[in-house]
């Protein structure tokens, strides 16, 4: 009589266990969906991040390199900069950085364009781009965004207003023989910056407006913009002008009326981005920093710096916490690509390491995304 009762009890316990396990597993899957849904990033937010980084570099170069050096050193920015020993015009600097980023083949692309271009390559390439440009000229407070459905793939595109933020911009356009417009003033919308983000293969018959981007993809885009601007600044500004004995880069660049070091160029623009409080940050960090404030801020950054020093071909990524908030971080190797960088670190009295060579890993660029 006990055997049937035992079987009933055993079956009951087994059923309760299976039901409980099913509920736990279902909750675990739900939690994972909520987690990844929370950290994935809408393309509009990703485009805002990218534009903020582009704009910070554009403003700093225009105001603190071009305009400042024109006043303090009589060093001009000219169209034929390569042959005249001068600075690149702000739009040439952005063109060079966008070409560098676009050639990396990561999918994201950006470029400068205008309704009044001096060079036809900067004109809108479609009727929709022209409509978008007109929209941001009329209402510069909001970007013009849309999703393009090309075959089986989708692309998010956004046009942001490009303001006249430096005297060099208005002077060039107002005085250029090929300029269709010659009455620009400071603060005017002179054109737009278009950002193109691939969203992947289309999964439904209609355009999917709810596609999200993984944070590591967005971090890659941001790093691409940062690294491209730094590369152009190091190669075409610092190294070129120093090689020609025109102007040098120094640590005390403001007081000495000189060029900022490439590392300072990055740190100055990162501060501009940080001040806008968008939930985005990028910094230059190192295990052997000249300035201790540029060391790793947490254990994740320390481990990440060690990882990219051993495996510089890929970033070190992960989710952690900072100041009580969930963050996603990606650490990319910072390579010695400029003789100016090497000379500064190897000769600086406070440098812990003095034997850097070209293409050595000198530290890392950490991109931080605050998760909503």
Regions found by a protein language model. Name each.
Residues 1-9:
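Bacterial N-terminal signal peptides that target proteins for export
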Residues 10-17:
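Bacterial N-terminal signal peptides
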Residues 21-168, 178-337, 350-372:
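Extracytoplasmic c-type cytochrome modules immediately beyond a signal peptide or single-pass transmembrane anchor
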Residues 171, 343:
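Short, cysteine/histidine-rich loop/knuckle motifs that typically chelate Zn2+
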Residues 175, 347:
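Cys/His-rich metal-chelating microdomains
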């Amino acid at each position: 009589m006990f055997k049937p009762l035992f079987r009933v009890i055993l079956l009951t316990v087994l059923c309760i266990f299976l039901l409980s396990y099913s509920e736990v597993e279902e909750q675990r899957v739900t939690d994972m969906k909520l987690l990844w849904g929370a950290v994935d990033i809408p393309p509009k937010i990703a485009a805002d991040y990218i534009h903020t980084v582009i704009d910070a570099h554009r403003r700093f170069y225009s105001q603190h390199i071009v305009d400042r050096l024109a006043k303090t050193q009589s060093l001009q920015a000219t169209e034929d900069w390569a042959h005249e020993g001068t600075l690149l015009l702000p739009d040439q600097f952005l063109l060079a950085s966008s070409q560098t980023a676009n050639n990396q083949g990561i999918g994201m692309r950006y470029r400068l364009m205008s309704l009044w271009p001096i060079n036809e390559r900067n004109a809108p390439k479609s009727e929709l781009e022209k409509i978008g440009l007109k929209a941001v000229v009329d209402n510069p407070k909001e970007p013009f965004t849309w999703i393009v459905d090309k075959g089986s793939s989708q692309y998010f595109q956004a046009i942001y207003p490009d303001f006249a933020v430096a005297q060099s911009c208005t002077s060039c356009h107002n005085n250029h023989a090929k300029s269709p417009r010659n009455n620009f003033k400071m603060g005017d919308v002179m054109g737009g910056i278009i950002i193109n983000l691939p969203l992947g293969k289309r999964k439904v018959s209609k355009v999917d407006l709810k596609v999200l981007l993984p944070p590591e993809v967005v971090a890659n885009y941001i790093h691409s913009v940062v690294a491209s601007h730094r590369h152009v600044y190091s190669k075409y500004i610092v190294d070129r002008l120093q090689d020609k004995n025109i102007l040098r880069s120094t640590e005390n660049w403001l007081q000495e009326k000189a060029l900022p070091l490439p590392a300072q160029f990055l740190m100055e623009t990162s501060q501009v981005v940080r001040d806008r409080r968008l939930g985005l940050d990028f910094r230059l960090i190192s295990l052997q920093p000249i300035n201790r404030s540029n060391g790793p801020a947490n254990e994740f950054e320390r481990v990440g710096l060690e990882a990219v020093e051993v495996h510089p071909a890929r970033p070190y990524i992960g989710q952690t916490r900072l100041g009580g908030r969930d963050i996603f971080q990606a650490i990319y190797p910072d390579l010695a690509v400029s003789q100016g960088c090497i000379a500064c670190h190897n000769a600086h009295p406070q440098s812990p390491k003095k034997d850097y060579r070209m293409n050595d890993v000198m530290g890392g660029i950490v991109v931080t995304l605050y998760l909503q």
